[in-house]
């Protein structure tokens, strides 16, 4: 392929750009050989003429086709060069928001500066077990590759994370470690990862600082080794640190800070415990104020310091050590602020003895002040003969002080790392490890010094190792494919490394110059010029004699030699170290001890020891002078070699972190900065190595599918695809060097795939043009015929329309004439009527106007008269008030005068009666006051009487005067005339009004009738409309109400279902956790057994029960205390891994544990007391003779008790009858008055129930007491050595005493009825005397035992009262203290405090009462249950005794007669002996195979076990029932544990366990479970035992088996899902193939073909369904199983779809929809579509539809939002970002469209989780499913070997 073909018109190229580095352009003209320029058009439509270098003939880089842009692996690009790499990273980062990209073996990680939801547990589980190229690039994929290669190759691995400061190295390393912790067995973060994460705050505090590029820059490198055992579980970790930047302790550039710990300590200086540190603000110290700003925006140093302290505590650093660490750090700050004064001579200096900073430094480190002051300013020189003490200049002292500060900090740093390693260390043997290296990338600044030199030197070594590894992998790939290997020219940086570290290299010359006493940086630089000026990698700057340039692999770096020697020496004088060694603080002395580090002072300026606290140190070297010998460069070179040795011994994996911009803006890409880092981190070198060979590689099958369109038809006849591919390539590419045929792949040179894509596109374009031509011609013909037919039709219709329109016109003209005639007539009539009505109206209004005017005049005159009347009245009243006010004033003056006189008289009288007033002050005052009041009232009465008489006379005179005036006015003649006129006017007015009113009445009547009629019609119409509206409203309301009620009911139902599902899920999760804990316990027990078998110290065996599972099941004979202790011990051994359980359950368990502990203590005390009593009685009483009691004593005792109870019963009956009569009388009265007999009937029912309960309780008490007495007698008769007879009953869980009177009566009855006993005949003939003596003796013993018991009770009661007394005393003391505190408060506070105290007291009392009620209720239930059990036992014992007695008598009568048993009907019970139980469990459970029962009844073992349980119930043997059920459950667990991957066995025991559970419910006797039973089945119910608790245990066991069944099925299906659902072509020829990169040929991928098709999944599910149906599993459970499996298929498929770019295409959506439809069809064919499995697939269905929908316009966005309701916003956006067209004819999804989708989905409250939880399990429900079989119809096959079972 010639250059002209490549550079043709419309070809896109890359040209350099100063702003964007590279810019895209398109050729507007073909290029020809010899052209000096190219005609280009830029993306902004600008025309550009691009010149070509004629000498080099270097054309611009070609751009890859759009189909290759955005690939996961950069090596999949056809054209591999810098602009292609940069553009691909930019597109992925900005448009798709993908921060990870592969570049061969390198993972490129771009820091997004934003939290992304791609690091959760679900993502970890999705990447776990996947091949590296199958999923999208991720740090988890690299970690999984390392973990997989470690497990497969058994070789240690390393992950090398590098990059600039702020590029995200630490975060990447953190997520890699989290992945290892999760897949390595520490997913709960409770072991190693938690400690490693806890070390992060510490290492950030002491090793991170603010720089100009990063606020939290790590100033050291670390290598963390995560150790694994043989099972590849994490067992420990170890940390090594490198390149600590010590110089930052004493110097910081502008806008930078020292290490964070200094500022954190200053921020916390105000705390009380840090007062002795004498710290203030960070601005006050020299070492923390050089950079300027001491704070970081958004960072709280005090809060970070608290996190640092917590991390120290978590890692086990003691408080004393923490305080010592902080003292050392504070002392460094004080040391930096010491004031050093130069002397006049300039060769010496001194420090003031009163220097506060030096005093604080010495005090904090515990050293001598005078010695440190002296040796800071002096140094000791040692020669062969003498020792000199020499002064130092100011600069030398400052350098020595800084070196000491750096040395102290470096030693402290090492000590902290050592303790972190101790916390991460494990005693177990490490099998392999994975190391994570977090180290600096290549650095270059404006001024580069010794630190940058060390960093770049380390990166040269790492790049060399990287290049060799890449070269090796390329060679292995070529050899594997059997391609001829040709050497590839790649950059070898060994000459640069030799320049630095070889003999007489830069480091060697630097060490040599450091040995010279007066060596300088200038001399060293001159030596470099002289020695290495000829080297290609060394250059001398033109304008400087103190700088030099090294050509590194990434770039040229200019280093300034100033400070190299001083930093390389880093001299710390031994005298200062010796002072620190003599510190009185152990930690300070330990830091500088010789056996710690032989060369502690020369840790590198930016590189400390390579392995801190990891390797053992060598013995210290004796030095001749007083300063240490090894230089920083030497140590750094040694540590670097050790690191390289470690890395070379492992398989490396590379992560290169890129910083996209310096402003830390989220998802902002700066091309310049990115290119710099890509060049520096070796990514472009990887690209160059790949491009030098055959970077594009295609499998034959993929190549054939992609480029089959280029194959000729005759070549398709060949069936050999390899031969077809060879033929096609030989025809298309003429140069044979451009491709190579490998064993399984075809290798192409760079650009060849792009050329093939061009040919393919041309072929498609030609075919498209041909198709378009043909289709367009056909469309035009069809269009012509359609137009012709349409024209004829239009003509016909138009002509008809015109004729119709003419006829219509004529008809309208005629109608218009008629309308005009009638209209004109109507208009004339209306005009006449209008004129007539107007005249009438005008007349009426005129007449009314005149009338109103006359009326208004008359009205005005009348109103004037009224006004005059009221005015005159008002004037008269005002005159009267004026006269009355004057009279009142005169009266007041007179009264005042009179009062003064009276006052004067009273005063005179008061002076004369002074003595009497003193004697009777009170009475006199009262009398005087009363007398005064009476006088005042009399005077007031007189005054009022006088005023009344005066007022009366005045009013009389005024009335007379007014009468006279009225008479005078009436006599005047003018007034009579006005009155007459007024009367006439009034009469005329009334007549006029009468006429008007009559007329108006007539008009109103007429109009009223008319309006009423209209109104009536309107009302009727309105009423009709209202009725219609009301009817519609009622209908709508009814519909709305029904809809609302239905919606509310549905919402409530959904809520209840959801709550039920959550509760069930929570419970089943607890069951699952319990089973996991049980499994963990078994593992730990096995491990402990192995440990105990090893020689050495062994622990004594515990006295715990040997039964493994008794504690798991309720039993009468099993102690709950022991179970709880076992559970607590298990929790302690497991390490509280599941402590995150529900808090309510946890609190209940705690409470139960406390109760059981108290109960255990009480029982222990009682047991000890009982043992003491027994021992005392054994010593006190002599042995007794045998006692033989007649069993007929029980009959006598029963007769006596029966008589007593009968008498009591008669009394109670009489009382009850009287009560019934009284209630009946009252009820009749109430019925007669109210008529409600319900209360009477209810009361009678209650009385009946109470009566029945009383009778039952009486019988129970009688039977129990009888059994107690008989049991005591038998025990006394059977035990010869029994020392005494206990007064307590021996029934388990019972503490009731035997009644004394009952015991005495019982033994009297024995004495009376036992007159024929022969054993006591030696006393008298009848034996009565001996019998009486024996009875009295027994009674005496009973009384003695009872007396002792009472004394013990009395002692216990006394102790209890003492304890109560002490508690009351404590409470009184507390109350007194509270009272004293209350007195100090204000009154309001006292009231409030008192109320609070009362509330708290009442709350405590309420809680105590509730607890007491719970205990009493619990005790009551327990006693009732025991009473029932004992009653049944007593009845069965009596029946057995009677049966035995009758059998004994019958045997005595018929001793010689043989009786044959008749054959009885099988009652559905199976009898077995106790010793056959183990054989039964072995044959029926442990050794049973499901194939043995293939032709029998399903769930036969469950039926057999129930028949055995029923016989044990029939014989009332509770121990047998308990033992059988416990053994069965344990046997099932053992079988499932043994066959934990056998689906058939698990399904078999799930069906049998559920059937046994159903049988226990069906035959329990509960009416709720007996509704579907037949009469025969009801006869098979249990009679004696309530096995409800065992039903719960079986339910839990069923849940565990179900979860194991799902786990097995998921394990079988999961490897098939991705291949069958996403990769397999269900519709042939639909999907295309795209080129793949290096990761698709990763070493972790298996060579075999593991592809599956959808038929494999359906076939496997058919097998599952058949097995479950054959074994009789309930249909409801089968539905739940397939619902869970379909959810797992949905989750795995969707998660892979969200993490794989290669499957997000239209064709995959089509294939996926087809596969889902096939699964739905399978569900319908098996009648499983009602299980809800289809609903679980809804997210996957919507994802498939999303891949097929249009993605361009706003309407498309709305359609997507309305359709994808089951997908979250993140999932929708992720799929759109991943969507990749398979050919160039399909457009990509634009960024604007994705933003539109995001804007429309903002209102959704979606979870932040991207992936579905594939581990989620729906809660299982076991609905009750009774069996129709009867127990007597079941036959046991002989293959079960159960001949020892007897049918009953």
From Swiss-Prot:
Record-level Gene Ontology MF annotations: actin filament binding; ATP binding; calmodulin binding; microfilament motor activity; small GTPase binding
Result, substituting residue 1361 to P: In DIAR2; uncertain significance
Effect of substituting residue 336 to R: In DIAR2; uncertain significance
Positions carrying Phosphoserine: 1446
Effect seen on changing residue 492 to G: In DIAR2; uncertain significance
Disease cited in the entry: Diarrhea 2, with microvillus atrophy, with or without cholestasis: A disease characterized by onset of intractable life-threatening watery diarrhea during infancy. Two forms are recognized: early-onset microvillus inclusion disease with diarrhea beginning in the neonatal period, and late-onset, with first symptoms appearing after 3 or 4 months of life.
Assembly mode: Component of the CART complex, at least composed of ACTN4, HGS/HRS, MYO5B and TRIM3. Interacts with RAB11FIP2, RAB11A, and RAB8A. Found in a complex with CFTR and RAB11A. Interacts with NPC1L1;. Interacts with LIMA1.
Binding-site list for ATP: 163-170
Residue ranges of coiled coil: 899-1266, 1341-1471
Family stated for the protein in its record: Belongs to the TRAFAC class myosin-kinesin ATPase superfamily. Myosin family.
Effect ascribed to mutating residue 799 to W: In PFIC10; uncertain significance
Protein name: Unconventional myosin-Vb
Region spans: Requires for interaction with LIMA1: 21-40
GO cellular component, one term: cytoplasm
GO biological process terms, semicolon-separated: actin filament organization; endosomal transport; protein transport; renal water homeostasis; vesicle-mediated transport
Effect recorded for residue 392 to T: In PFIC10 and DIAR2
Domain spans labelled Dilute: 1526-1803
Region: Actin-binding, residue numbers: 640-662
Gene3D superfamilies tied to this protein: 1.10.10.820, 1.20.5.190, 1.20.58.530, 6.20.240.20, Kinesin motor domain, Myosin VI head, motor domain, U50 subdomain
Protein source organism: Homo sapiens (Human)
């Amino acid at each position: 392929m010639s250059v002209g073909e490549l550079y043709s018109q419309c070809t896109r190229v890359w040209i350099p750009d100063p702003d964007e580095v590279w810019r895209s352009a398109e050729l507007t003209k073909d290029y020809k050989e010899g052209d000096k320029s190219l005609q280009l058009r830029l993306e902004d439509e600008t025309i550009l003429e691009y010149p070509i270098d004629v000498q080099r003939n270097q054309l611009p880089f070609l751009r890859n086709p759009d189909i290759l842009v955005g690939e996961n692996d950069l090596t999949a690009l056809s054209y591999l060069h810098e602009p292609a790499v940069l553009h691909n990273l930019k597109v992925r980062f900005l448009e798709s928001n993908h921060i990870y990209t592969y570049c061969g073996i390198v993972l490129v990680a771009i820091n997004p500066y934003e939290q992304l939801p791609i690091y959760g547990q679900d993502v970890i589980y999705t990447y776990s077990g996947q091949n590296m190229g199958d999923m999208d690039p991720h740090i988890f994929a690299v970690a999984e590759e390392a973990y997989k290669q470690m497990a497969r190759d058994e070789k240690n691995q390393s992950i090398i994370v590098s990059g600039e400061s702020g590029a995200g190295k630490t975060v990447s390393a953190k997520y890699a470690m989290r992945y290892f912790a999760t897949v390595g067995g520490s997913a709960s973060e409770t072991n190693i990862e938690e400690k490693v994460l806890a070390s992060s705050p510490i290492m950030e505090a002491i090793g991170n600082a603010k720089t100009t590029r990063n606020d939290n820059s790590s100033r050291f490198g670390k290598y963390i080794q995560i150790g694994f055992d043989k099972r590849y579980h994490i067992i420990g970790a170890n940390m090594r640190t490198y390149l600590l930047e010590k110089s930052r302790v004493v110097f910081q550039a502008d806008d930078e800070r020292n290490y964070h710990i200094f500022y954190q300590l200053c921020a916390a200086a105000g705390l009380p415990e840090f007062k002795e540190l004498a710290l203030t603000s960070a601005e006050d110290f020299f070492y923390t104020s050089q950079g300027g700003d001491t704070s970081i925006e958004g960072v709280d140093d005090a809060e970070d310091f608290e996190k640092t302290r917590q991390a120290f505590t978590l890692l086990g650093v003691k408080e004393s050590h923490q305080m010592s660490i902080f003292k050392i750090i504070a002392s460094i700050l004080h040391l930096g602020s010491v004031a050093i004064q130069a002397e006049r001579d300039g060769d010496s200096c001194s420090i003031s003895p009163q220097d506060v900073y030096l005093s604080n430094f010495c005090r904090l480190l515990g050293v001598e002040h005078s010695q440190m002051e002296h040796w800071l300013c002096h140094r000791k020189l040692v020669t062969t003969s003498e020792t000199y003490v020499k002064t130092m200049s100011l600069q030398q002292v400052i350098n020595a002080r800084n070196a000491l500060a750096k040395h102290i900090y470096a030693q402290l740093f090492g000590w902290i790392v050592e303790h972190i390693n101790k916390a991460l260390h494990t005693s177990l043997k490490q099998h392999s490890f994975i190391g994570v290296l977090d180290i600096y990338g290549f650095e270059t600044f404006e001024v580069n010094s010794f630190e940058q030199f060390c960093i770049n030197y380390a990166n040269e070594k790492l790049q060399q190792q990287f290049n060799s590894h890449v070269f090796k992998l390329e060679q292995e790939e070529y050899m594997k494919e059997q391609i001829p290997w040709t050497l590839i020219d790649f950059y070898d940086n060994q000459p640069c490394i030799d320049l630095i570290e070889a003999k007489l290299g830069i480091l060697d010359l630097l060490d040599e110059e450091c040995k010279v006493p007066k060596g300088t940086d200038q001399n060293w630089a001159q030596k470099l010029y002289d020695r290495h000026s000829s080297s290609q990698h060394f250059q001398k700057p033109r304008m400087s004699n103190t700088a030099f340039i090294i050509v590194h692999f990434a770039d040229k770096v200019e280093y300034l030699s100033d400070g190299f020697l001083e930093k390389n020496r880093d001299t710390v004088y031994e005298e200062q170290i010796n002072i620190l060694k003599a510190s009185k603080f152990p930690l300070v002395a330990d830091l500088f001890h010789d056996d710690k580090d032989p060369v502690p002072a020369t840790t590198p300026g930016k590189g400390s020891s390579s392995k801190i606290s990891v390797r053992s140190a060598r013995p210290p070297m004796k030095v001749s002078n007083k300063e240490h010998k090894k230089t920083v460069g030497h140590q750094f070179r040694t540590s670097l070699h050790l690191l390289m040795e470690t890395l070379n011994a492992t398989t490396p994996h590379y992560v290169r972190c890129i910083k996209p911009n310096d402003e830390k803006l989220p998802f902002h890409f700066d091309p310049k900065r990115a290119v710099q880092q890509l060049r520096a981190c070796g990514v472009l070198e990887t690209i160059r190595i790949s491009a030098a060979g055959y970077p594009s590689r295609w499998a034959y099958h993929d190549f054939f599918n992609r480029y089959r369109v280029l194959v000729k038809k005759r070549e398709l006849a060949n069936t050999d695809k390899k031969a077809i591919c060879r033929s096609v390539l030989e025809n298309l590419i003429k140069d044979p060097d451009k491709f190579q045929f490998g064993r399984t792949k075809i290798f192409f040179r760079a650009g060849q795939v792009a050329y093939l894509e061009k040919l393919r596109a041309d072929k498609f374009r030609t075919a498209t043009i041909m198709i378009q031509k043909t289709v367009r011609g056909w469309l035009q013909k069809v269009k012509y015929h359609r137009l012709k037919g349409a024209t004829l039709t239009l003509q016909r219709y138009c002509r008809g329309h015109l004729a119709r329109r003419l006829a219509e016109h004529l008809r309208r003209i005629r109608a218009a004439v008629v309308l005009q005639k009638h209209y004109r007539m109507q208009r004339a009539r209306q005009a006449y009527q209008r004129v007539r009505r107007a005249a009438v109206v005008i007349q009426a209004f005129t007449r009314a106007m005149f009338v109103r005017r006359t009326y208004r005049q008359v009205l005005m005159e009348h109103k004037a008269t009224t006004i005059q009347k009221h005015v005159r009245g008002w004037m008269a009243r005002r005159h009267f008030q004026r006269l009355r006010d004057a009279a009142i004033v005169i009266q007041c003056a007179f009264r005042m005068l009179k009062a003064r006189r009276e006052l004067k008289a009273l005063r005179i009288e008061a002076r004369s009666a002074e003595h009497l007033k003193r004697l009777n002050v009170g009475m006199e005052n009262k009398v005087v006051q009363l007398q005064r009041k009476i006088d005042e009232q009399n005077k007031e009465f007189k005054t009022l009487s006088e005023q009344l008489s005066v007022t009366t006379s005045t009013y009389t005179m005024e009335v007379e005067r007014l009468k006279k005036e009225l008479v005078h006015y009436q006599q005047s003649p003018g007034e009579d005339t006005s009155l007459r006129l007024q009367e006439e006017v009034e009469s005329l007015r009334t007549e006029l009004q009468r006429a008007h009113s009559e007329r108006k009445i007539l008009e109103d009547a007429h109009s009223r009738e008319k309006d009423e009629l209209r109104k009536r019609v309107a009302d009727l119409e309105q009423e009709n409309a209202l009725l219609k509206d009301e009817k519609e409203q009622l209908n709508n309301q009814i519909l709305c109400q029904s809809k609302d009620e239905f919606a509310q009911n549905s919402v409530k139902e959904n809520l209840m279902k959801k709550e039920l599902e959550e509760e069930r899920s929570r419970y089943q999760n607890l069951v699952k956790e319990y089973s996991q804990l049980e499994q963990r316990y078994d593992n730990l027990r096995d491990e402990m057994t192995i440990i105990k078998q090893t020689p050495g110290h062994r622990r004594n065996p515990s006295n715990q029960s040997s039964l493994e599972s008794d504690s798991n099941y309720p039993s009468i004979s099993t102690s709950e205390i022991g179970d709880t202790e076992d559970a607590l011990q298990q929790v302690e051994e497991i390490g509280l891994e599941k402590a995150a359980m529900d808090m309510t359950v946890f609190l209940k368990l705690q409470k139960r544990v406390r109760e059981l502990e108290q109960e255990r203590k009480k029982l222990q005390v009682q047991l000890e007391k009982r043992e003491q009593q027994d021992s005392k009685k054994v010593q006190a009483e002599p042995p007794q003779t045998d006692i033989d009691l007649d069993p007929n004593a029980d009959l006598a005792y029963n007769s006596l008790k029966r008589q007593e109870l009968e008498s009591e019963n008669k009394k109670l009956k009489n009382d009850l009858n009287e009560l019934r009569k009284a209630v009946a009388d009252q009820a009749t009265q109430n019925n007669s008055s109210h008529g409600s007999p319900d209360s009477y009937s209810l009361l009678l029912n209650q009385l009946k129930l109470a009566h029945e309960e009383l009778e039952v309780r009486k019988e129970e008490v009688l039977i129990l007491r009888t059994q107690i007495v008989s049991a005591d007698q038998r025990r006394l008769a059977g035990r010869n050595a029994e020392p005494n007879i206990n007064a307590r009953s021996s029934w388990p869980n019972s503490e009731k005493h035997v009644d004394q009177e009952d015991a005495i009566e019982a033994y009297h009855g024995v004495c009376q009825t036992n007159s024929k006993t022969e054993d006591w005949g030696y006393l008298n003939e009848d034996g009565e005397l001996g019998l009486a003596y024996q009875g009295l003796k027994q009674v005496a013993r009973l009384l003695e035992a009872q007396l002792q018991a009472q004394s013990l009770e009395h002692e216990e009661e006394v102790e209890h009262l003492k304890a109560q007394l002490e508690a009351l005393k404590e409470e009184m003391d507390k109350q007194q203290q509270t009272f004293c505190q209350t007195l100090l408060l204000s009154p309001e506070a006292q009231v409030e405090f008192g109320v609070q105290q009362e509330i708290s007291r009442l709350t405590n009392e309420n809680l105590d009462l509730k607890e007491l009620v719970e205990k009493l209720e619990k005790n009551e239930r327990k006693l009732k249950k025991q009473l029932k059990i004992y009653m049944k036992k007593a009845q069965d014992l009596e029946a057995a005794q009677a049966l035995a007695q009758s059998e004994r008598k019958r045997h005595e009568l018929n001793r010689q007669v043989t009786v044959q048993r008749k054959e009885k009907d099988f009652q559905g019970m199976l009898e077995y002996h106790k010793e056959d139980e183990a054989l039964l469990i072995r044959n029926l459970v442990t050794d049973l195979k499901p194939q043995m029962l293939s032709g029998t009844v399903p769930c036969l073992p469950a039926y057999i076990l129930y028949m055995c349980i029923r016989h044990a119930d029939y014989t009332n043997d509770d121990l047998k029932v308990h033992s059988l059920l416990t053994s069965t459950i344990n046997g099932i667990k053992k079988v499932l544990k043994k066959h934990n991957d056998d689906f058939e066995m698990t399904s078999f025991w799930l069906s049998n366990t559920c059937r046994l559970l159903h049988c226990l419910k069906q035959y329990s006797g509960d009416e709720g479970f007996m509704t579907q039973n037949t009469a025969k089945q009801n006869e098979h119910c249990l009679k004696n035992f309530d096995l409800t608790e065992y039903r719960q245990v079986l339910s839990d066991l069923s849940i565990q088996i179900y979860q194991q069944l799902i786990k097995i099925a998921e394990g079988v299906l999961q490897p098939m899902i991705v291949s069958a659902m996403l990769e397999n072509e269900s519709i042939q020829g639909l999907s295309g193939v795209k080129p793949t990169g290096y990761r698709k040929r990763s070493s972790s991928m298996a060579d075999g073909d593991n592809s599956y098709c959808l038929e494999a999944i359906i076939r496997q599910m058919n097998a599952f369904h058949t097995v479950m149906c054959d074994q009789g599993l309930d249909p409801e459970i089968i539905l739940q199983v397939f619902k869970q499996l379909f959810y797992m298929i949905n989750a795995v498929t969707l998660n892979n779809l969200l993490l794989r770019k290669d499957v997000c295409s239209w064709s995959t959506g089509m294939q996926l929809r087809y596969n889902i439809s096939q699964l739905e069809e399978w569900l319908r064919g098996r009648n499983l579509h009602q299980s809800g499995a289809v609903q679980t697939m809804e997210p996957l269905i919507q994802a498939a539809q999303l891949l097929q929908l249009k993605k361009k316009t706003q309407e498309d966005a709305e359609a997507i939002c309305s359709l994808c309701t089951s997908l979250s916003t993140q999932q929708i956006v992720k799929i759109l970002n991943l969507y990749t067209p398979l050919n160039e004819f399909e457009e990509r999804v634009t960024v604007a469209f994705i933003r539109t989708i995001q804007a429309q989905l903002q209102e959704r409250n979606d979870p932040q989780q991207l992936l579905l939880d594939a581990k989620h399990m729906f809660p299982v429900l076991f609905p009750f499913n009774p069996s129709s079989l009867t127990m007597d119809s079941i036959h046991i096959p002989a293959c079960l070997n159960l001949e020892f079972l007897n049918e009953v």
